[in-house]
Design a protein with these regions (language model features):
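Glycine-rich flavin
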Residues: 2-4, 21-27, 33-148
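N-terminal Rossmann-fold NAD(P) dinucleotide-binding loop
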Residues: 15-16
């Protein structure tokens, strides 16, 4: 069992900011994230930044005024590739920002509570038992619209 001052479940905006701040104050921190494709959270990966990038590329395409469907298809393909490159770069920077810190350990896997102070992180190949004095849940949320 590995012991930490804090365990943060979720590598989104709140989790990464909290982990960096706690590490700056000398805390030994574990961060668990289910998906390598979500380091940095929704805004970086599937929300604000990629959608705004695609809007920008659509505007640029409009200025170029492609004359055929094939040209539009190529513009779209290039926009998707550019968006993927951007989000990949941001994910990598966010990951390195925490993983390069001496007092932060990033675990990529599904985290669940074993007890009030223990978390199990299951990866594709292993399982880690972590103990934390403080545990923060930063997993995001999904909107549910109730039937009326």
């Amino acid at each position: 069992m590995k012991k930490y001052d804090a365990i943060i479940i979720g590598f989104g905006k709140g989790g990464k900011t909290l982990a960096a701040d706690l590490a700056n104050h000398g805390w030994n921190v574990a961060v668990g994230e289910r998906s390598t494709g979500m380091y940095g959270g929704t805004c970086i990966n599937i929300g604000c930044i990629p959608t705004k990038a695609l809007v920008h590329y659509a505007q640029v395409t409009g200025y170029r005024r492609p004359s055929t469907f094939e040209q539009y298809a190529e513009e779209f393909k290039q926009a998707i590739l550019a968006k993927e490159k951007l989000t990949s770069l941001l994910r990598e920077k966010n990951f390195k920002n925490l993983d390069d810190r001496e007092t932060v350990t990033v675990y990529t896997g599904e985290a669940s509570f074993r007890s009030p102070y223990e978390i199990v992180v299951k990866t594709d190949t292993d399982s880690f038992l972590l103990e934390g004095e403080k545990i923060f849940i930063n997993t995001g949320a999904t909107t549910i619209i109730p039937t009326i």
